[in-house]
Amino acid sequence: MRRTAFIVLSLVALIAPCVTSVAVEDLAQANNIETNVNPNVKVGSRRHLRSEANGRLAVVDEEKVFRDFCGLGPCFDWLKPQNLGGFIYKFVEWASRDRVNFKLKMLKREHQIPIRKRNQ
């Protein structure tokens, strides 16, 4: 189960950057926003979308748009390719901690007899 989840999340991490740019472009087209209209804004920066509806610069965070669009929340930060190593480490840490906690719970259930102190 966890191996399957790990494989799926790894694939999402590889595909996510492509989907992010496509989702932002689709969002811009749907809201009639032209990209890179303002010459003072650097191409590729986070402030590169201009709203034609009210004529002011819209600050758009591409990653936030993608997170909100897919409902991933802050977990998406671990799925970015540059953080993939950290994500794998966190996943392994989580899996091993979960296994240790499970074993401790089982041991507590097996030995429900209270441990007495020696002097009593």
UniProtKB/Swiss-Prot annotation:
Alphabetical keyword list: Host cytoplasm, Host nucleus, Secreted, Signal, Virulence
GO CC, any one term: host cell nucleus
Principal location class: secreted
Domain of life of the source: Eukaryota
Sequence motif: RxLR-dEER, positions: 47-64
Domains as described in the record: The RxLR-dEER motif acts to carry the protein into the host cell cytoplasm through binding to cell surface phosphatidylinositol-3-phosphate.
Entry function: Effector that acts as a broad suppressor of cell death to interrupt plant immunity. Inhibits cell death induced by cell death-inducing proteins, including the PAMP elicitor INF1 from P.infestans.
Family recorded in the similarity comment: Belongs to the RxLR effector family.
Name of the featured protein: Secreted RxLR effector protein 29
Organism: Plasmopara viticola (Downy mildew of grapevine)
Annotated gene: RxLR29
